[in-house]
Amino acid sequence: MAALKEDRSYGLSCGRVSDGSKVSVFHVKLTDSALRAFESYRARQDSVSLRPSIRFQGSQGHISIPQPDCPAEARTFSFYLSNIGRDNPQGSFDCIQQYVSSHGEVHLDCLGSIQDKITVCATDDSYQKARQSMAQAEEETRSRSAIVIKAGGRYLGKKVQFRKPAPGATDAVPSRKRATPINLASAIRKSGASAVSGGSGVSQRPFRDRVLHLLALRPYRKAELLLRLQKDGLTQADKDALDGLLQQVANMSAKDGTCTLQDCMYKDVQKDWPGYSEGDQQLLKRVLVRKLCQPQSTGSLLGDPAASSPPGERGRSASPPQKRLQPPDFIDPLANKKPRISHFTQRAQPAVNGKLGVPNGREALLPTPGPPASTDTLSSSTHLPPRLEPPRAHDPLADVSNDLGHSGRDCEHGEAAAPAPTVRLGLPLLTDCAQPSRPHGSPSRSKPKKKSKKHKDKERAAEDKPRAQLPDCAPATHATPGAPADTPGLNGTCSVSSVPTSTSETPDYLLKYAAISSSEQRQSYKNDFNAEYSEYRDLHARIERITRRFTQLDAQLRQLSQGSEEYETTRGQILQEYRKIKKTNTNYSQEKHRCEYLHSKLAHIKRLIAEYDQRQLQAWP
């Protein structure tokens, strides 16, 4: 579309595409070849009788684009469909269309929120073009470079000492052997032969074992696996038998074509495989700890066995990353995140935009619940299989876990859990928010502690601040005069005073889920986690959609001066939105409390599994 001009105002309208219309908006990610096909068709579409078409088949489909050079033929590109709103509640955005009205004015129209993403898969010509570009770049580099042989370098077979006899002097020991010069070319050939003999140790092994030990480190695509096998030597017979072998020992992913070694095959992996480097052996050690601690009777995971873990999840040091690797669609909620310590006191922090503040500026919905102790160091957990992997990016449960990447230090760091009192989600509570606050003069049920003059002055200064800065639902003594009793918080959150900071009853999951002592118990906990995580994600997505409008209005209100006309108008919009949500979402309060409960429960199960994996890794010889 045309670029927007500076210093010019545009009107933005919504609703041209109603909810009952047949128009859907998608976020489309094209490859270079697909983009060129579209541009070629648009440039000469008048001369082509066919029209582009798109067909959906579940979460997959294909796009057909006519070729101007061959009017009777069309290029077909396959794609897969992913849900942005479900995988990442904060990653969706709106689709804006720019058009010119009949009067010649430029308008912007919001067509709706983009919840789905179409990703076009790469074709063979894309890989062929990439290979040609790499070969051309390598040839140019080789033509401008030269091999410099240095003393002690890789091309020098051994150090040679040249000894010149003294002139005119006879050798006192005729039988002494003298060092003779060594031809440099022969030394290079010998060193190359020794390197080949080292690699031949792997090439002489059975082809099945070679494939099995490569897949034990990380998932491979078939093309990547062929390139890796060719380094150690690959015959045509082995190449032809690769497809059948992969069906026996690996799980094939229908989405990105990656091959992951089956869990039952890890028992045949040798830790002293000659093709493994020291780093590969350390990586294999961590993988075996995770795989072998699970009961073999469980077989594959609860999900589709073909849904193997994404490439790059394990063993990134084994081979360099590939350009066309697809990013993983999910992130393990039990995976290790960067070490982070929560600092929550008895007075809960104000909730802003539906989330609790974190000292380092990042956003977290909840601290990790822990046992009734001051702090509790959570042992880092190795990655779990894909069924436990929830959607990525800003996941509320992922925020309470540690992710140390794949640097080989998975179990050397920990996360400090929050104290036992659980802070509730700072999201709009549509019930029990209109209770009037207690006047200052009313007696309290329990006698408060005496406070120093310094603390009293601080509290008095905090109370004198404008109410617009406090995320409160209930009107208080210092509220704006004339505000109705059901005035919501300016960002849609409940009063901090309405959020309990402690509980008199022990949650049922603390009694049900104790420390893990066996692999069967660990598998049972993991199954319980998988059973309730989908419900938690759905609840969180619905709550996020409700609070998004309050977040936008709160940001506008903070930029206005209190008492101005714009301030009162925005405040009226907040009240209107609050009443609207209260009517249309009668079960919001129950869903919010259910989401908080599931968050604490799943975080507790995650911590127990992480501690068990840490103990298993420490006990590994």
Curated annotation (Swiss-Prot):
Residues 446-457 have a biased composition (Basic residues). Residues 374-383 have a biased composition (Polar residues). The modification N-acetylalanine is found at residue 2. The modification Phosphothreonine is found at residue 180. It is found in: Nucleus; Nucleus speckle; Nucleus, Cajal body. The record marks 46 as: KMT2A/MLL1 fusion point (in acute myeloid leukemia patient). One of its GO terms (molecular function) is cis-regulatory region sequence-specific DNA binding. GO terms for biological process: in utero embryonic development; positive regulation of DNA-templated transcription, elongation; positive regulation of transcription by RNA polymerase III; positive regulation of transcription elongation by RNA polymerase II; snRNA transcription by RNA polymerase II; snRNA transcription by RNA polymerase III; transcription elongation by RNA polymerase II. Residues 406-415, 458-467 have a biased composition (Basic and acidic residues). A motif (Nuclear localization signal) lies at residues 445-459. Keywords: Acetylation, Chromosomal rearrangement, Nucleus, Phosphoprotein, Proto-oncogene, Transcription, Transcription regulation. Residues 296-417, 431-504 are annotated as: Disordered. The modification Phosphoserine is found at residues 309, 561. Residues 436-445, 474-504 have a biased composition (Low complexity). Residues 507-617 form the OCEL domain. Expressed in all tissues tested. Highest levels found in placenta, skeletal muscle, testis and peripheral blood leukocytes. Its main location: nucleus. The keyword Nucleus applies. GO terms for cellular component: Cajal body; cytosol; euchromatin; histone locus body; nuclear body; nuclear speck; nucleoplasm; transcription elongation factor complex. It is linked to A chromosomal aberration involving ELL is found in acute leukemias. Translocation t(11;19)(q23;p13.1) with KMT2A/MLL1. The result is a rogue activator protein. Elongation factor component of the super elongation complex (SEC), a complex required to increase the catalytic rate of RNA polymerase II transcription by suppressing transient pausing by the polymerase at multiple sites along the DNA. Elongation factor component of the little elongation complex (LEC), a complex required to regulate small nuclear RNA (snRNA) gene transcription by RNA polymerase II and III. Specifically required for stimulating the elongation step of RNA polymerase II- and III-dependent snRNA gene transcription. Belongs to the ELL/occludin family. Component of the super elongation complex (SEC), at least composed of EAF1, EAF2, CDK9, MLLT3/AF9, AFF (AFF1 or AFF4), the P-TEFb complex and ELL (ELL, ELL2 or ELL3). Component of the little elongation complex (LEC), at least composed of ELL (ELL, ELL2 or ELL3), ZC3H8, ICE1 and ICE2. Interacts with AFF4; the interaction is direct. Interacts with EAF1 and EAF2. Interacts with ICE1 (via N-terminus domain). Interacts with ICE2. Interacts with USPL1. This is RNA polymerase II elongation factor ELL. The gene is ELL.
